[in-house]
């Protein structure tokens, strides 16, 4: 049968689409599709992009990925893909894919910080990397090195990084880019529930009556989930309600029954308005039994700062930055804050001194009466006036929308799901606003129930599965454990077979502080893995200069030359998703594994291999002796204890951490891997010359399986249970905790969660035990020294409205919001290499209200400068596009390195979660 490529593509697409929706496929189309797929091998895998976790089928032929389609058997996406998902194959074969290590060298071929990039061998790359690491490590100790990790690590990669950096090098300066996207959600989960990650699952979409999005443009950022929302809405348009709360109109508004455009930061006030409506005007709606049996009321300090440098006159600040920087020490209360902080005895014009009482867990129990008192100012009139974000909308219209919003939550029999992503997380009070969502759902008893719950959606494919569950944050260990807790360190040392006292008890530098420490000379070696920190971090002009400081050495492991690679000193070419084994964990706690489909391109190698090879270059005697952390802490010499465990000071970290006797018991030849590549285990046909200059022939044991089986010991029996390695390769993922082979759909609900049943506290049990001992007090402060244990209960927090540190002014009159677009992923490092996606959206635009553009004398598509106190970028204006901003606000996506918008953004963070607020700063815009 002969037919054209065009005919084949049409028939294959038709067959796939028909299969996805359950239609029968015409025999001719099916025959054409099968003919075109001769010699293809299909295997299940996972999409490389967002946190939805779509299952895909990957086809290989002649050692190349030749096609990708949605997996009809995958429960998340049911055969559908979004526009990015369909191009999973093409991200791997961009024209400028990195294929060899690149080092800055002089004319003699020697490393030179001011030299140009030239290809070098893996041996040369690791020789220089080792020397530079040891220089920083020997001079500054474990605090002198840092690793930018990722929510795009595979689970095994993240676990290996945590074990190497924290267990091997005894440094906690490992922090993922998930700090930028999920840290506020994490902090709120831990403070509220005592355990991380959502209670519900995606099935809530089909089971609910109401979907309310808060700072979540799901139509573009989680399009497959939005397809499910759309299907639910259209199934019963009159009953099912969709509400979109945002600071600008976006595609999610197209389906919404109500669109609420609010002023940046005032989501804090809107949540409190809803709670006030419940408590003051509809007390009958409170689920008193749920609240009494399963919750307590709590609050915390407000003088927590804004997560900027505490040295407000830091030498590296530009003079233009100083007025905003000063708010880290104190601020004058605005008129709005004079109302919302009245319960503290403060008024507008008072000066609040920032005492930085922002440690997670620094809160206390209050009475319901105090909680009610604190909500009193958040009347409909006050909140509507404060929060109305569209000056062209009448106040009465906005008030009517807020009332309808509250009524939907309050309606007794109505099921409600609240979804949010970066709009709430990237927020200088991100932890607070996350906690407010639970406040409302708890009051109504609409949490941890099928079809009802507050649901934080993850942005990255394994921000949950790796960054959070594995513990690649600077303060965490696997399974919600933390470095500061001696019991948690003891558990980790036992599983990792480390001498007692090896692990560093002091929290490391978080993502933003790794940048600041590079600028200050406190960190002199940084390794970038699976992300692009120099493009994704606010106030970027500072960090570009820091990277090029002569004393700093930057290593970037990447597949393409993004901004971070360009400012680095050494670039390591890295295998991409289907060129390695791995696993991701998505937003509904679903863990999914895949097999390596093809060998990496050129001489690129997997991150697991890179870390393993680097670990070979360090002997125990170099890293496990006494190590000074600061003036108060010196880590003990554990070499004698290591000897007692059978280790030698001459042993390498590779031998102890990754190639020990247990690891070697995982046989190289495994039925799961039969017929598939496994570069780390066997090497591959490329015969890559490895870090020792010899052809790499593999480790001879199944390192990925070993890493998985060791890792899951941390969570089993503790509410984080995972299945064994083989099981995941037979299923389309499982939602943890996986107990007796069964996944858990709704946590904390005894009907569905075996841990909740085991607790024996009734229908619900919020069994997380972190931060569950707290004092009692009033709205001002704790009043008891004694701490009271909280068992199987969650916390209902009161958190007030406070202004962000930077707001529009006469000089910088516009709000700036940043974010993503449907067609591109994060910094565009992968998707900008896909011709179809590049042609669809070739550049980042400055979305602006037509009247704002008219005032500036700017027409559609004309170039403007977007300038803040920190920097400026040039972009073309769009007044008609997908993102329709209100007067006074502009939106610029960050995927385009030529429109380097993070030069403009403020590096303020939530002081509790340390997550950067990319959603609000002040700018001026003028014609270029």
From Swiss-Prot:
Residues 1-33 form the signal peptide. Component of the periplasmic nitrate reductase NapAB complex composed of NapA and NapB. GO terms for biological process: Mo-molybdopterin cofactor biosynthetic process; nitrate assimilation. Mo-bis(molybdopterin guanine dinucleotide) binds at residues 84, 152, 177, 181, 214-221, 265-267, 422, 426, 532, 557-558, 580, 607, 818-827, 902, 919. Its cofactor is [4Fe-4S] cluster; Mo-bis(molybdopterin guanine dinucleotide). Keywords: 4Fe-4S, Electron transport, Iron, Iron-sulfur, Metal-binding, Molybdenum, Nitrate assimilation, Oxidoreductase, Periplasm, Signal, Transport. One of its GO terms (cellular component) is periplasmic space. Substrate binds at residue 894. Its EC number is 1.9.6.1. Gene3D superfamilies: 2.40.40.20, 3.30.200.210, 3.40.50.740, ADC-like domains (2.20.25.90), Dimethylsulfoxide Reductase, domain 2 (3.40.228.10). One of its GO terms (molecular function) is molybdopterin cofactor binding. Transmembrane segments: none annotated. This is Periplasmic nitrate reductase. The keyword Manganese does not apply. It comes from the Bacteria. Pfam families: Molybdop_Fe4S4 (PF04879), Molybdopterin (PF00384), Molydop_binding (PF01568). [4Fe-4S] cluster binds at residues 47, 50, 54, 82. It is found in: Periplasm. Belongs to the prokaryotic molybdopterin-containing oxidoreductase family. NasA/NapA/NarB subfamily. CDD domains: MopB_CT_Nitrate-R-NapA-like, MopB_Nitrate-R-NapA-like. Residues 40-96 form the 4Fe-4S Mo/W bis-MGD-type domain. It catalyses: 2 Fe(II)-[cytochrome] + nitrate + 2 H(+) = 2 Fe(III)-[cytochrome] + nitrite + H2O.
């Amino acid at each position: 049968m002969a037919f054209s490529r065009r005919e084949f593509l049409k028939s294959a697409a038709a067959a796939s689409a028909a299969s996805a929706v359950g239609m029968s496929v015409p025999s001719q189309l099916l025959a054409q599709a099968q003919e075109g797929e001769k010699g293809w091998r299909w295997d299940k895998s996972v999409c490389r992009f967002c946190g939805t976790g779509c299952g895909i089928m990957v086809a290989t032929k002649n050692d190349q990925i030749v096609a990708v389609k949605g997996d009809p058997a995958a429960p998340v996406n049911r055969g559908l893909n979004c526009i990015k998902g369909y191009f999973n194959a093409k991200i791997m074969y961009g024209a400028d894919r990195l294929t060899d290590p690149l080092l800055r060298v002089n004319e003699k071929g020697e490393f030179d910080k001011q030299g140009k990039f030239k290809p070098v061998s893996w041996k040369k790359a690791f020789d220089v990397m080792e020397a530079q690491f040891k220089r920083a490590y020997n001079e500054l100790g474990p605090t002198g090195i840092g690793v930018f990790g990722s929510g795009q690590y595979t689970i095994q990669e993240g676990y290996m990084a945590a074990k190497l950096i924290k267990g091997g090098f005894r440094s906690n300066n490992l922090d993922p880019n998930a700090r930028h996207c999920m840290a506020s959600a994490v902090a709120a989960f831990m403070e509220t529930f005592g355990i991380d990650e959502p209670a519900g699952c995606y099935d809530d979409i089909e089971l609910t009556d109401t979907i309310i999005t808060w700072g979540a443009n799901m139509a573009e950022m989680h399009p497959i989930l939005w397809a499910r929302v759309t299907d639910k809405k259209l199934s019963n348009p009159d009953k099912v309600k969709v509400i979109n709360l945002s600071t600008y109109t976006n595609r999610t508004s197209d389906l919404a029954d109500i669109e609420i455009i609010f002023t940046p930061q005032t989501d804090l006030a809107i949540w409190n308005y809803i709670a006030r409506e419940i408590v003051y005007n509809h007390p009958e709606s409170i689920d008193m039994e749920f609240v009494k049996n399963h919750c307590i009321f709590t609050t915390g300090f407000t003088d927590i700062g804004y997560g900027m440098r505490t040295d407000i006159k830091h030498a590296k600040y530009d003079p233009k930055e100083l007025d905003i920087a000063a708010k880290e020490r104190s601020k004058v209360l605005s008129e709005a804050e004079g109302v919302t902080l009245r319960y503290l005895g403060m008024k507008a014009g008072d000066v609040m001194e920032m005492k930085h009482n922002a440690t997670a867990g620094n809160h206390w129990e209050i009475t319901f009466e105090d909680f009610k008192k604190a909500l009193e100012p958040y009347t409909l009139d006050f909140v509507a006036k404060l929060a109305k974000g569209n000056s062209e909308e009448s106040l009465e219209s906005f008030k009517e929308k807020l009332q309808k919003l509250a009524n939907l939550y309050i309606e007794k029999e109505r099921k409600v799901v609240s979804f949010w992503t970066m709009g709430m997380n990237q927020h200088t009070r991100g932890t607070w606003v996350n906690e407010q969502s639970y406040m409302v759902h708890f009051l109504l008893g609409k949490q941890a129930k099928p079809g009802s719950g507050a649901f934080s959606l993850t942005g990255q494919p394994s921000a949950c599965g790796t960054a959070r569950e594995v513990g690649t944050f600077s303060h965490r260990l696997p399974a919600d454990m933390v470095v500061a807790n001696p019991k948690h360190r003891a558990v980790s040392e036992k599983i990792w077979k480390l001498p007692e006292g090896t692990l560093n008890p002091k929290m490391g530098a978080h993502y933003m502080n790794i940048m600041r420490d590079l600028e200050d000379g406190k960190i002199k070696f940084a390794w970038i893995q699976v992300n692009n920190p120099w493009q994704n971090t606010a106030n970027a002009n500072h960090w570009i200069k820091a990277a090029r400081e002569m004393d700093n050495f930057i290593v970037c492991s990447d597949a393409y030359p993004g901004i971070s690679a360009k400012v680095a000193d050494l670039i390591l070419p890295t295998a991409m998703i289907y060129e390695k084994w791995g696993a991701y964990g998505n937003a509904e706690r679903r863990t999914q594994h895949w097999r390596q489909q093809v060998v990496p391109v050129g001489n690129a190698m997997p991150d697991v291999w890179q870390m393993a090879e680097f670990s070979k270059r360090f002997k125990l005697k170099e890293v496990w002796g006494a190590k000074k952390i600061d003036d108060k802490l010196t880590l003990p010499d554990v070499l004698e204890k290591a000897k007692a465990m059978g280790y030698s000071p001459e042993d390498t970290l590779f031998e102890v951490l990754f190639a020990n006797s247990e690891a070697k018991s995982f046989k190289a030849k495994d039925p799961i891997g039969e017929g598939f590549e496994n570069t780390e285990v066997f090497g591959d046909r490329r015969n890559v010359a490895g870090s020792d200059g010899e052809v790499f022939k593999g480790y001879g044991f199944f390192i990925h399986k070993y890493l998985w089986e060791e890792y899951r010991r941390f969570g089993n029996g503790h509410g984080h249970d995972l299945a064994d390695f083989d099981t995941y390769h037979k299923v389309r993922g499982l939602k943890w905790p996986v107990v007796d082979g069964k996944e858990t759909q709704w946590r904390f609900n005894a009907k569905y969660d075996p841990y909740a049943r085991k607790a024996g506290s009734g229908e619900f049990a919020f069994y997380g035990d972190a931060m569950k001992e707290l004092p009692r007090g009033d709205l001002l402060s704790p009043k008891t020294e004694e701490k009271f244990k909280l068992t199987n209960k969650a916390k209902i927090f009161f958190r007030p409205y406070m202004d962000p540190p930077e707001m529009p002014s006469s000089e910088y009159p516009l709000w700036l919001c940043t974010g993503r677009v449907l067609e591109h992923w994060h910094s565009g490092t992968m998707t900008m290499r896909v011709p179809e996606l590049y042609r669809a959206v070739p550049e980042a635009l400055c979305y602006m209200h037509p009247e704002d553009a008219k005032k500036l004398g700017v027409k559609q598509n004309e170039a403007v400068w977007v300038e803040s106190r920190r920097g400026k970028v040039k972009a073309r204006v769009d007044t008609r596009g997908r993102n329709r901003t209100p007067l006074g606000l502009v939106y610029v996506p960050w995927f385009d390195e030529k429109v380097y918008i993070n030069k403009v953004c403020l590096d303020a963070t939530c002081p509790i979660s340390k997550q950067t607020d990319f959603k609000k700063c002040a700018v001026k815009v003028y014609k270029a």
